[in-house]
Amino acid sequence: ALIAGYESQQAFSSIFKTMYKQTPLEYRQNEVFYPLQLEFTLNKNPTAPDTMMQEISYATLADIPDWMNFITLVIDGFPCLDENSHLEQVKQYVQRRQALIMRDGSTIIGAAAFSYQTGSIDFLAVHPQYRHYGVAKAFLDFMMCNLFVGREISITTFREGDKADTGQREEYKRLGFAESELLTEFGYPTQRLILPPKQEKGDNG
């Protein structure tokens, strides 16, 4: 702790618990280790599609290897994510046509998985290099116009004040999501956010 620049072991433990929601000892004893950020390589020639929604397609089984590589770039938004479990879930979403991707050339720059039944977005992530390109909004617009017409959409994210949040919660609220109930998912404190149905022009209701 001292070598890393912390004033004391207590200071390190306090900050560690703020980020991981458990003490260093509990973290070791649980033997379930997960990163809050991994190294990633930037796309040397990024481009912003002129028509984002037109670049969205349903993911296929052939896309899954790229999807799993993409996961390592966006791990900061998914504490406690287990890659093996996620892989099995992605296969199911793909087979049900409930998984979407967006690419810049061969690079996946965004991915989403959702449930028709519950109206929930169960996974939504954007490549760190493209988080100011409107990718998340494009996915939402696509789903609201094609999949959840007239329905509200829900998503879960970090709770307010979570030090592990790199801006995901703020982005969702900027896109129109409103706070709903507090949850605990996979042992991690989260909160459900709700996006109301998109109103058509002239709809006074």
Predicted features by range, described:
Residues 10-19, 137, 160-181:
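Conserved active-site alpha-helix within GNAT-family acetyltransferase domains
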Residues 77-105:
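Active-site rim helix/loop that mediates acceptor-substrate recognition in acyltransferases
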